[in-house]
């Protein structure tokens, strides 16, 4: 008799064991091609990530892999074990990049199940994981927590796992690669973007004027390249019946990357490193053809070291209407959507807190 | 008097000489960018091709270029001399990858005309070629035969060829790079995909659940990158009048790559090398916007060496309907379409036999 | 009180100072990924730019970055300071590539304001700049002049510039990398494309038969990768109100690249280097979905050195109708559109003069 199998991956609520660590099976060498495909969608003005000269001028041995690419790889690698059945991605917290990853490094990721609970309606649950991305030497290059909404029960057709004999350190270490620990040497060049640490004051609001329309092919290429295996992003047949939008939806990590890139000429042009992301959420979904825009609010500014300081921004991404127009209409752009009693901004697609190490002029 | 030329390439039936070898003019260094663009469309779970760590753990000096990319380059390089006038690509046979190609290698290809004959209607013909892809040292990295349907007569505007003083070895050598000849060392990592050699039994059918919708830009980018010069894939003006579909059609080598990638988490996650493809055909064409799915049937399993064995799959690719649904409707999925008296599966876009070297658990 | 800023970049007519040099802030390492993305849109037959073997055979140390990619980077890097507010790109002149750029080089660009003047209607002006692209050692790898049509007045929300303490040499040096100065060694291979220096005669017209349809994602990816920051290419919301086409328009440097690539099998298959482009203009715009075609006319042929000679082509790009059909209808294809009293070719999207160093058979 013919044995017909239809393997499915990801987990439903009862498939998760609190305390378990899943070693995600993907094993990928990051190369210059990935960097270019990332740069072809996300026009990031932060010099360290784009220029070997700029990177070496701050003490790194080469141009590092963009932290946002690492975050996207971490999320995507984890889909196979964590969220391939998920209904929604709910939150990012405590995202950090404690060491530089370079092209040529080979990456893996694992996820620790921190918690899980059914939602009050009882027909689904929230799972809370911490994902860590390490290179071929076991060096931690990205760590973050996220929450996802998953269906109840179990995935019937899930093949038995290969052994997951991995452990995660209890708390990930600092927020800055060790190469960037000392005082910051002066910039390697004349000219450059205008927005140094000195240019920001707490309370400043910046509406970033240029938007980016999302291409149908490009978001699928990125999801595929990242090894994101959720059919919602690339399988139109699945999406017609199973997507809230009745069509393919852009992977949230890409939406976040677009919004950070759109803000970058105004906020990160004198940037040196991403000190972390926190309190991130996706209030609504994005489709191919949507145009994304960004706005930033300065919520903290601190001296960090000789030649540089940190600035913390609250970043908001919206679709199809420039944020300046929304502010003119009185939109409450920077209050988190979750828990808003009124004034929900239906155009909002992402909100997150980002801390950057920026060069100082003074 | 003005001399107006309108050069055209490829060959019609009378342009082919049996026994001739055409040295295709393309001369291309394969780089990490090509690997990434390939990985951005084809999410392949086979670790050797994606991870330098995994590749070195089996004895290769670096992550090799995906065999499927080599096959695609070979087909595409040959279009200029062989199939730029072709009406259809009919068959692939005896595809093998006897040596590893690495990023940085520079590739050329040549095609030997094995045979040609008019079809019975007399208004077209079938040409049968063997194409070989070699690196800068003349090392054979890919060999295959294919058949194409071409118009009768000659291409009037074809410029005279540069000399083709190349020879092909009579029969291509083995199916495995010499670095992989010895016993297979244990895997380099904990965890990984579940489907080892031990998990397959002859007769097993696997329907791969996730599909992939094809982007308009991405399939044109790949055809262009591969140096496929047939206007059917990228020239909408040509295609409106000359394509069977009245629009651009996705290059068949890409369709094959999508279908193999869609099957890969369930069949190739413990894969080490592609031992060959055979008896491949494209029963119908694929357009941008179509969603591809795959199904596999295990047709042979053999012990090959210490730590690994070979499994031979019959793979089928279909469009816009998941294979599980087709099987539920009683579709005869795994019988070749050519020569079927009845029960033709109109959704089928590719069928091929693939042999993989897979790790064993036992 | 909240300070809301909406920074805008580029310059309007009164923002330009004749004699000023703007050091563009982008600082980008060119990598194999950029080369592959470029090759995935522009199928260029010129061997030097695609093959390490071919490049080394003429004395270069590696496969160089395509000159057309350098020109595109130069134009795009300058948008932030020069043309982000521009209404139209009017002309390219004196484009040259005096040194080879290799993958791994880090590029910057600067623009010297050569002149500016209001147009007669008084509601806009023309700015004329010379842009230079240099590598990490200050070596000039691309120089060109261009003219753009800009609005009158000033950009109110433009942040104050970082200091631009850069100087440009008065006149860029030669047209050939020093590695290519000596006699040309024979080709590294048997076979290759047919069109050597010997095959062209002044007055020859060549209609290139295969067209290329432009993908929506791919042209946005390229504009983003190049760091072109004009919203016209990627921001559909902006374009609906501010584009002449009421939708996104393809960056002209890409249109030029497509047209040169479409001509390349017939003109550049025996090419060694681009000796320069001149008298270039874009008579009309191109949108995603348009199909581009090319035609060439030989306007000069000279002996240049042992083994090679130069050929100068007048190249024309048209959209959605093959040039052979336009010629059959009596179109005056090779007369520049600007200043034509009658017989304007409305399908024409680019025209430019290109000089190539080509191998000789004799």
Model-derived features: positions:
Chain A
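HotDog/MaoC-like acyl-thioester-processing domains
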Residues: 1-18, 101-185, 288-290, 295-362
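Hot-dog-fold acyl-thioester-processing enzymes
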Residues: 1-92, 142, 153-275, 333-351, ...
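Short, structured motif recognition centered on aromatic/hydrophobic residues
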Residues: 38, 92, 107-111, 131, ...
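Short, low-complexity cationic-aromatic patches
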Residues: 65-66, 98-103, 250-251, 285-288
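A cross-kingdom feature marking solvent-exposed beta-strand/loop segments within repeated
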Residues: 91-99, 114, 273-286, 299
């Amino acid at each position: 008799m013919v044995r017909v199998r239809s393997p499915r991956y990801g987990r439903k609520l009862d498939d998760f064991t609190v305390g378990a660590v899943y070693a995600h099976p993907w094993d990928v060498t990051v190369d210059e091609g990935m960097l270019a495909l990332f740069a072809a969608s996300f026009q990031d003005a932060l010099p360290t990530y784009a220029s070997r000269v700029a990177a070496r001028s701050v003490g790194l041995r080469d141009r590092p892999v963009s932290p946002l690419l690492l975050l996207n790889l971490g999320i995507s690698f984890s889909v196979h074990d964590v969220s391939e059945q998920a209904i929604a991605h709910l939150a990012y917290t405590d995202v950090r990049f404690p060491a530089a990853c370079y092209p040529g490094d080979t990456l893996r990721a694992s996820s620790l199940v921190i918690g899980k609970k059914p939602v009050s309606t009882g027909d689904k649950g929230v799972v809370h994981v911490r994902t860590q991305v390490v290179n071929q030497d076991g060096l931690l290059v990205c760590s973050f927590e996220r929450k996802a909404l998953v269906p109840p029960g179990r995935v019937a057709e899930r093949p038995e796992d290969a052994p997951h004999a991995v452990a995660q350190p209890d708390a990930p270490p600092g927020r800055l690669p060790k190469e960037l620990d000392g005082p910051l040497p002066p910039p390697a060049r004349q000219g450059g973007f205008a927005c140094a640490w000195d240019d920001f004051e707490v309370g400043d609001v910046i509406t970033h004027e240029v938007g980016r329309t999302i291409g149908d092919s490009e978001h699928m290429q990125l999801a595929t390249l990242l090894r994101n295996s959720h059919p919602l992003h690339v399988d139109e047949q699945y999406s017609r019946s199973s997507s809230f939008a009745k069509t393919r939806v852009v992977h949230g990590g890409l939406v976040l990357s677009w919004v950070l890139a759109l803000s970058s000429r105004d906020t990160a042009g004198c940037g040196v490193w991403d000190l972390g992301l926190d309190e991130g959420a996706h209030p609504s979904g994005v489709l191919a053809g949507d145009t994304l825009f960004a706005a930033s609010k300065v919520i903290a500014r601190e001296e960090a070291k000789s030649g540089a300081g940190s600035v913390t921004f609250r970043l908001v991404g919206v679709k199809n209407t420039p944020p300046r127009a929304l502010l003119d209409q009185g939109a409450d752009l920077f209050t988190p959507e979750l828990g808003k009693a009124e004034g929900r901004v239906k155009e909002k697609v992402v909100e997150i807190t980002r801390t950057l190490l920026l060069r100082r002029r003074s």
